[in-house]
Every structure is written in structure tokens, then in C-alpha cells.
Design a protein with these regions (language model features):
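General marker for long, soluble alpha-helical cores
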Residues: 1-80
Length: 80
């Protein structure tokens, strides 16, 4: 975690890393300058919800698309 503090993320990005750390999530999956803070947010929420974030772990997918995928994964899990 301390190494990520030195990696010059903007405040909004680092906030998502910090929240993942506090929640006990594997924030290393999204702690990359390649992701916007909004994308990091959707990945963090997916990890928290225990959905397969690898499906949308791609910085070319917009945060809004990530949200749609995450919600669909949540919905399909509840149907099973």
C-alpha cells in the first residue's frame, strides 16, 4: 500500500486505492495510471460485490460501460 502512495496518482485515483485497501480488496488489480478514477471505482465495486471483474478489467472500456457490465453480473448472479 505504501508503495502506491509514492506513485503519483491524482487524489481521486488514490482515493479509490485507499478505499480498496480499507475494504481489504485486491486494489492492485486497478491501481494503475491507465485507469481513470471512475474506472477504478467500478472495478473496486465489482471486487467488493465479488463479481468477476476480469470481464471488464480493460482501460478501453468506459466507466459507464463497466458499470453496466458490473450491474449485469450482479443481476445474473442473483437469478442463479
Amino acid at each position: 500500500y505504501n508503495a502506491y502512495k509514492r506513485m503519483k496518482f491524482n487524489q481521486l485515483q488514490f482515493d479509490q486505492i485507499h478505499r480498496g485497501y480499507i475494504q481489504g480488496l485486491d486494489f492492485s488489480m486497478y491501481a494503475s495510471h491507465n485507469y481513470s478514477w471512475q474506472q477504478m471505482h467500478q472495478i473496486r465495486l465489482g471486487l467488493y460485490d465479488k463479481v468477476d471483474v476480469s470481464i471488464y478489467l480493460d482501460n478501453s472500456i468506459s466507466a459507464e460501460e463497466m458499470k453496466e457490465i458490473r450491474l449485469q453480473l450482479l443481476k445474473s448472479r442473483k437469478v442463479e
